[in-house]
């Protein structure tokens, strides 16, 4: 993965499945640089909801309803999810600060622990492989799902594959940091580079399958 590949990647369409212990749904996520997101959720072939970030405003919608603009507090997690690259690659956006805390072991790998504090005060720890520089873990305090209380969560990244010369993790596992209890497993089925135009990012519940 090089800087040239990163600069040429302008958008991605991701098709995947999120499995929870008692639930599962398919999603299609459209992303465009620098920070636009449209995420549609499905049960089977039925669209159940959509949400996203236009670059300035977070929004949500369900089939048959009007688009709802979210407050900065309500939409903060969506806005973070909309970042095309992590703060480690995007040059500390929006006043974020990065601090090298030290190093630790992740499985059998030596990893750098980089603490990120965003402009809004939200904090995360990124554990990066000291040899490959791939992201291995992310730790932060947030809600597992909408409407739930924030807890310490560790996200693990696996199965990196090249997408237009950029390595993407195709498997993501979230666990409670306190006891390792499984929260969710996300598996990407398809990642299409540079396939999303501006029209695809329109807020609302038009299906994008």
Model-identified regions with their sequence ranges:
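Gly/Pro-enriched, hydrophobic low-complexity segments
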Residues: 44-47, 107-205
């Amino acid at each position: 993965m090089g800087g040239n590949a990163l600069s040429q990647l302008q958008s991605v369409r991701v098709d995947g499945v999120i499995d929870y212990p008692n639930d599962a749904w398919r999603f299609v996520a459209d992303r465009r640089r620098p920070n636009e997101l449209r995420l549609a959720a499905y049960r089977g072939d039925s669209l159940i909801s959509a949400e996203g970030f236009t670059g300035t405003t977070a929004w949500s919608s369900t089939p048959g309803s009007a688009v709802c603009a979210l407050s900065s507090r309500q939409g903060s997690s969506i806005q973070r999810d909309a970042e095309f690259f992590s703060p480690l690659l995007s040059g500390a956006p929006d006043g974020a600060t990065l601090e090298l805390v030290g190093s630790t072991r992740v499985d059998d790998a030596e990893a750098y622990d980089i603490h990120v504090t965003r402009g809004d005060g939200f904090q995360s720890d990124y554990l990066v492989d000291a040899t490959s520089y791939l992201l291995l873990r992310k730790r932060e305090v947030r809600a597992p799902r909408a409407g739930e209380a924030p807890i310490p969560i560790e996200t693990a990244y696996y199965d990196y594959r090249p997408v237009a010369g950029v390595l993407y993790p195709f498997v993501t596992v979230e666990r409670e940091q306190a006891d390792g209890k499984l929260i969710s497993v996300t598996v990407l089925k398809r990642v299409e580079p540079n396939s999303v135009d501006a029209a695809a990012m329109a807020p609302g519940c038009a299906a994008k399958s």
